Regions:
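Phosphate/diphosphate-binding loops
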Residues: 129-174
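Single conserved hydrophobic/aromatic residue that forms the stacking wall/gate
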Residues: 1-12, 199-210
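Short coil/turn connectors at secondary-structure junctions
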Residues: 77-79, 112-115, 150-154, 176-178
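Terminal amphipathic helices with adjacent charged low-complexity linkers/tails
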Residues: 8-9, 13-43
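Generic secondary-structure signature for well-ordered alpha-helical cores
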Residues: 8-9, 13, 35, 39, ...
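Mobile "lid/hinge" segments at catalytic clefts and subdomain interfaces of large enzymes
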Residues: 8, 176-200
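A glycine-rich phosphate-binding loop feature that marks nucleotide/adenosyl-phosphate handling sites
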Residues: 16-28, 66, 119-126, 159-167, ...
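Non-catalytic terminal/interface segments that mediate subunit docking, oligomerization
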Residues: 41-145
Length: 210
């Protein structure tokens, strides 16, 4: 991959071989890829492997900004970049490090004119005193800045949670940015999760409500 990051915008597309040389995974397995119970986590990398052509998935920066998974893959022979939430780390919340990772990746894809598929499952941005000490406002704002400058076509796939500004940031800074948007049957949308909203609006939560 490193040898493909310098030069023409076609070099990353060519790094995974001929577009005619591909083999699909069994797409029927995607029907049961996500748990029915929204409280259960799942392995996002296994879903990505099912969607991608066989042996075409390449992940980058795996151990950095772990709430976000980034890399390249082919879909029916067509090279594309992907960015995905990892619900097993911070519940998929976008922290400062993940925001940096996503921002840098958007910049890379825009520079190389790589189409992007964004798989979203996030409760939003990680907030709180610790996050603020890490420069969250500045670093998360940079993600919106990178999204606003994105020239590559972007497709948004909402796997589960699509809440708040964090979800918008992962699809280019606006829900109107993607060229196409779709959702799994488990998709949820809103300014924040229903539990968080209830906790904010009710002084005491009736027993059994949550």
């Amino acid at each position: 991959i490193l040898s493909c990051l310098v030069g023409s915008e076609m070099c990353i597309r060519d790094s995974q071989g001929s577009e005619k040389a591909f083999e699909l995974n069994d797409q029927k397995m995607l029907r049961n890829a996500l748990p029915d119970d929204r409280r259960y986590t799942y392995e996002i990398r296994e879903i990505l492997k099912l969607i991608a052509d066989k042996e075409s998935l390449i992940e980058i920066k795996k151990d950095y900004g772990r709430a976000i998974v980034t890399g390249f893959m082919r879909i029916e022979g067509h090279a594309t970049a992907f960015i995905a939430s990892d619900c097993k780390h911070l519940g998929g919340a976008v922290d400062s490090e993940s925001a940096d990772k996503a921002s840098d990746f958007f910049d890379l894809c825009s520079d190389k004119n790589m189409p992007i598929v964004s798989f979203v499952d996030t409760p939003g941005f990680m907030v709180g005193p610790d996050s603020e000490k890490e420069g969250a406002v500045r670093r998360m704002s940079n993600l919106f800045k990178s999204g606003s400058k994105l020239v590559s076509p972007l497709v948004a796939i909402f796997l589960r949670k699509g809440y708040g500004l964090g979800a918008q940031a992962l699809v280019g800074g606006s829900l109107h940015k993607p060229a196409f948007t779709a959702a799994w049957p488990t998709g949820e949308f809103g300014g924040m999760g229903s539990v968080s909203y209830t906790q904010l609006t009710l002084p005491t939560i009736p027993t059994g409500l949550i």
